[in-house]
Amino acid sequence: MKTVTVKIETLSHDGRGVGRLNGKAIFVEEAVPGDVAEIRITGRQPSYEEAKIVRLIDSSEDRVEAFCPHYETCGGCQLQHLSIDAQRKWKASHFYTALSKAVNMKACQIEAPLVGHDHAYRRRARLVLGKNKTDKEARFGFRAKGSNEIVDIEQCPLLTPALNEALNQKRTAVLPHASRALKEISVVDADNGIFWSDQAVDSSTWPSYGVNGLTLNFPAQGFVQVNAEMNEQMVNKALDWLDLNKEQRVLDLFCGVGNFTLPIAQQVKEVVGIEGETDLVQMAQHNASRAHCEQATFYQADLFKDVTPQNWFRKQKYDRVLLDPGRQGAYQLCKGLGQLKADKIVYVSCNASTLIRDVKELEKQGYQLKKAIMVDMFPHTSHTEVMAQLIKTGKKPKQRGPGIFKL
């Protein structure tokens, strides 16, 4: 198949290199801005094309050798070929550029990204056991790039040492039981041991983790941030942005087991945590009791439905609101947040696009974006965590403008 030469100019939202040929964008796998490469087209769409590198003619100064032997086949990482500094610069720039195109940033301060270690940071993983269709060999590892095949993994440089040790032990036990029916098995490196999803856990041995001097239990198969170091930084940034005191009432939406709620409780008069999953509410209540946090109260509610009739919402006044929804965001919920008349809102998200959408809605209710930051929760992947702080002004949104950048 014919090859063409292209210079890579930027990165797409998913970390692919982007060049242009005959006025059309070309998305090139594992390409870095500054690369000049001979490429082969692998897919054509009306407005863009997709390609793979055949040969590098000139390498970008930001290009590095991938450190994992499975990088070319494993679907876990997307950016190991890009230096860690360049990764973080791209993630921050991509977020701030998208934000500035959508909302008023004239009064917004862009804070320097929160960063930490980029190896051995993952305390949670989801693995797959099964036999591949092609060679019928039993494998235990991660899904391959762009397919349901399994990449057999003995060690992952992003996992904590304890997880890698547990992974090797688990392989011996499960590989003889592999079949064509793929089985997902998750594992977490908790502060009190290794917990596998296929092993029963009772209340006396719930997994736990620490944050801000507190110990929080969580369900063995439930959510916990994969990066303990960055979670601590993120919680402390939220506390700083909330600007708390002992006279305040705070509402924590999508509170989980109390990751933000209980650190907030240490600094305020009252904090109310709302979560959709009953088992997480019960776990949060347990964590509050264990920590003697009488200031914290938890309720179960479907936050994707109308919550205005709920007692914790109706005719209530909160000084601060924090929300940390999943990837789908909280658009419907944000439509009613103005009724609470909170002076400040801190929004935490693993999906920049839904955060931006919801910030636009909060602008309509008289809130102004004051601070934004990228949190590098997932180094060497195209994923990131982002945060925004808004204050109540009562004014309608003005025209968009650039923020105050501190990269």
From Swiss-Prot:
One MF term in the entry's GO annotations: iron ion binding
Domain TRAM: from-to ranges: 1-55
Record has Magnesium as a keyword: no
Gene Ontology BP terms: rRNA base methylation
Keyword Iron-sulfur listed: yes
Positions annotated to bind [4Fe-4S] cluster: 68, 74, 77, 156
Keywords tagged on the record: 4Fe-4S, Iron, Iron-sulfur, Metal-binding, Methyltransferase, rRNA processing, S-adenosyl-L-methionine, Transferase
Sites where the protein binds S-adenosyl-L-methionine: 225, 254, 259, 275, 302, 324
Active site as annotated: 350 (nucleophile)
Catalytic activity: uridine(1939) in 23S rRNA + S-adenosyl-L-methionine = 5-methyluridine(1939) in 23S rRNA + S-adenosyl-L-homocysteine + H(+)
Pfam families xrefs: TRAM (PF01938), tRNA_U5-meth_tr (PF05958)
UniProt EC number: 2.1.1.190
Family in the record: Belongs to the class I-like SAM-binding methyltransferase superfamily. RNA M5U methyltransferase family. RlmD subfamily.
HAMAP family, per database record: 23SrRNA_methyltr_RlmD (MF_01010)
PANTHER family: 23S RRNA (URACIL(1939)-C(5))-METHYLTRANSFERASE RLMD (PTHR11061:SF49), RNA M5U METHYLTRANSFERASE (PTHR11061)
Biological role stated in the UniProt entry: Catalyzes the formation of 5-methyl-uridine at position 1939 (m5U1939) in 23S rRNA.
This protein's name: 23S rRNA (uracil(1939)-C(5))-methyltransferase RlmD
Gene responsible for this protein: rlmD
